[in-house]
């Protein structure tokens, strides 16, 4: 397995490997949801949101279409189709000097997609996330 945080992220996303999230998230990780007002702080809650997202987003249509990468951060643009709705969004990811993800922010468009994701993520999180 690679030591590059983005290579690791792409491997986990491709495999929908929620168990692998534990190894790449920092203990103080913060998740910024497009549908939750406050940041979700801590590794456990960040892992829960990302595991649910693996189930909701990562279907056969999901693909990253662009990646902008700095030394300790990246922006990944993605596209997917969920229930006939075109979803376009970005994952904004930061990591520390050890390569662990410290911040993960998701932004989505259009509004119809935001509403659909809100509904699906709420259902997945209520069901336990995986």
Regions found by a protein language model. Give the residues of each.
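Alpha-helix N-cap/loop-to-helix boundary motif
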Residues: 1, 13, 38-42
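Short acidic-aromatic low-complexity motifs
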Residues: 2-27
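Short N-terminal micro-motifs specific to bacterial/archaeal maturation
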Residues: 11-12, 37, 65, 92
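A solvent-exposed, acidic/Ser-Thr-rich amphipathic alpha-helical stretch
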Residues: 18-20, 26-71
């Amino acid at each position: 397995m690679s030591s590059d945080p983005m290579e690791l992220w792409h491997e986990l996303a491709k495999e929908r490997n929620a168990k692998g999230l534990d190894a790449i998230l920092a203990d103080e990780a913060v998740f910024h949801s497009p549908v939750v007002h406050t940041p979700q702080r801590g590794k456990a809650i960040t892992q829960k949101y990302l595991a649910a997202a693996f189930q909701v987003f990562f279907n056969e249509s999901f693909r990253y279409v662009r990646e902008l990468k700095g030394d300790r951060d990246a922006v990944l643009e993605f596209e997917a189709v969920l229930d006939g709705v075109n979803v376009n969004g970005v994952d904004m990811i930061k990591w520390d000097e050890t390569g662990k993800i410290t911040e993960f922010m998701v932004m989505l468009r259009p509004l119809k997609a935001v509403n659909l994701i809100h509904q699906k993520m709420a259902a997945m999180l209520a069901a336990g996330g995986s």
